[in-house]
Amino acid sequence: MTLVEVVISLAITGLTVAGIVTGYIFCLTTTVKDGLYMAANASALARLEETRSAIWAPDRAEPLDQLTAANFPDKVVTLDKSGDGSVITSATVRTDIAQLSLSPPVRRIRVDCIWKFKGVELVTNSIETCRAPDQ
């Protein structure tokens, strides 16, 4: 074996190891981001269920309307916490309720869960639905 062959084989080995390490880091980052996506989606769904359980009964003898944006202020939730508790990923859950139609009465409910990935990339998970009274 000559020195040139040894240098070329070391270069190929170095590139292979670098590719494996880069692939591992990419997979790890993607897995962490996916876990945060799922946690944010669960937080948005939880707030959507809160709005679904609010009473909206305009046809009662005494009309009752708890389905207003004022009853669902912005809420800060924890999506993830490191093992020692030093790194916390938090999100803000924002609820928007708008009247779509008066006859028949229908409201649009939109829930946004806004969070930052690694403190840099701003990500928003959104869920939107429509609701009629007494549902």
Model-derived regions: residue spans:
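Low-complexity, Gly/Pro-rich coil/beta segments used as flexible assembly/activation regions
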Residues: G35-Q135
